[in-house]
């Protein structure tokens, strides 16, 4: 969940440098290579969404790149854990096969699947929540992707209006966006 600001602030950097920063951030609490790779895959999709690719294209392009980027150790041994994601066919997986129990691979798959099988912010987040189990984590990850894909103006206004300290949050987001666009 903390990866999104790193990608937003560093999306113009080279992909290897951006991934290095993302992996460093992951290691603070989740040092296993599998967790770092999950964060890297999330970052690659986010970066592609930022460059105005539609969700399906952003996902496929990111996975194509990931198959080439994660060839060396320690990533090579972890690739098998991300098979469904890396094949680029996650949207075809039936809902009953999508896990949402908080395990890093399942969380990433569930969030990405929610994005790929819906067409707007609201439906993406609700689909993620309705998978159950670790719904708040999956919805936060999916919501980050959907926010980049569809923009703040597509977030239901009643959801924004319900935020505690809404004005402070919107001000912080505006300042962050200005900093990230430099």
What label would you give each PLM region?
Residues 1-2, 135-148:
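Conserved phosphate/anionic-ligand binding catalytic regions in large, soluble enzymes, centered on
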Residues 148-182:
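Conserved glycine-rich phosphate/nucleotide-binding loop
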């Amino acid at each position: 969940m903390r990866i999104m600001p790193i990608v937003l602030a560093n999306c113009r950097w080279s992909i290897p440098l951006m991934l290095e920063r993302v992996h460093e951030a992951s290691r603070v609490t989740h040092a296993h290579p599998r967790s770092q790779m999950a964060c890297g895959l999330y970052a690659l999709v986010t970066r592609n969404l930022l460059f105005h690719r539609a969700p399906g294209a952003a996902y496929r392009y990111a996975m194509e790149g990931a198959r080439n980027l994660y060839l060396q150790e320690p990533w090579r041994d972890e690739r098998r854990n991300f098979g469904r994601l890396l094949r680029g066919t996650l949207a075809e997986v039936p809902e009953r096969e999508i896990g949402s129990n908080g395990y890093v691979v399942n969380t990433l798959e569930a969030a990405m699947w929610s994005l790929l099988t819906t067409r707007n912010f609201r439906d993406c987040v609700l689909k993620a929540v309705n998978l159950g189990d670790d719904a708040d984590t999956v919805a936060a990850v999916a919501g980050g992707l959907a926010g980049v894909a569809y923009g703040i103006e597509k977030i239901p206004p009643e959801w924004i209006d319900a935020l505690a300290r809404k004005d402070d949050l919107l001000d912080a987001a505006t300042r962050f966006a200005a900093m990230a666009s430099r």
